[in-house]
């Protein structure tokens, strides 16, 4: 498995924001759903089945053929997304001519030099250092690692953030992500997750959660900070990295999902690598759509 964590397989329909948790989602199974596949995770949203699979050791052709058959059973169009360039080459080599690949900028991963995020050295991080310093001066804050004793505090932050951003109780990505966060905390240790929590005047106000992908790469899945505290995101970002991620070469902070503010924020930290991601559709289905459009 590389720095990206996983390949994601889904069918036609609106992409859900649940995929903030992409590589950990592979190992979460909702207790209310029957298991139909081995090493696959199925989620239901907006009436469409979303399927995720990791490309790693094993027979790639048999994995893809399995979900192709299932998509056909459901009468759904088939799509792969979150593919690296290397993975598109693997697919093309394994099943030549079957897929049409397209760059998906919204799904591309932001990968940072860990030392740059920890030390914020140099002119290009001048504004970040000042922002962090203002937070540290302005608030009575404390940091702690996430443990079973503060899981509830983190979930409370996630819920309050969801309410503040108008997502809870709605069929949108914000509510889906909050669901994924709660699922993650139910199996935190089993998933080998780790994270950090910030408090202001004793109140839990921000947390971050991730996992080690390999000895050189740490992947951050979730980062939530409540409104009303200037510099809070900068603070949780810095404190967790400084106290826990010194020994990693890279920190993968995942994609921006095409959200303008999120893209601006992630670019402002000067990623060392913007890892391009691709989607793949069946050439046969793409050609059918093109023919229909031409007829109409």
Question: Predicted regions: what is each one?
Answer:
Residues 71-75, 140, 243-250:
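Short, surface-exposed connector motifs at secondary-structure boundaries
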Residues 156-215, 219:
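A mid-sequence, solvent-exposed acidic-amphipathic segment
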Residues 100-120, 252-296:
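Active-site/acyl-donor-binding loops of N-acyltransferases
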Residues 2-87, 199-229:
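Conserved donor-binding loop and adjoining core beta-sheet/short helix segment
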Residues 76-104:
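Non-catalytic accessory segments adjacent to catalytic cores
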Residues 193-283:
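Aromatic (often tryptophan-rich) hydrophobic motifs at membrane interfaces
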Residues 79-80, 144, 250-253:
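Short catalytic-loop micro-motif centered on adjacent basic/acidic residues
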Residues 97-172:
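Acyltransferase donor/substrate-recognition loop-hinge adjacent to the catalytic core
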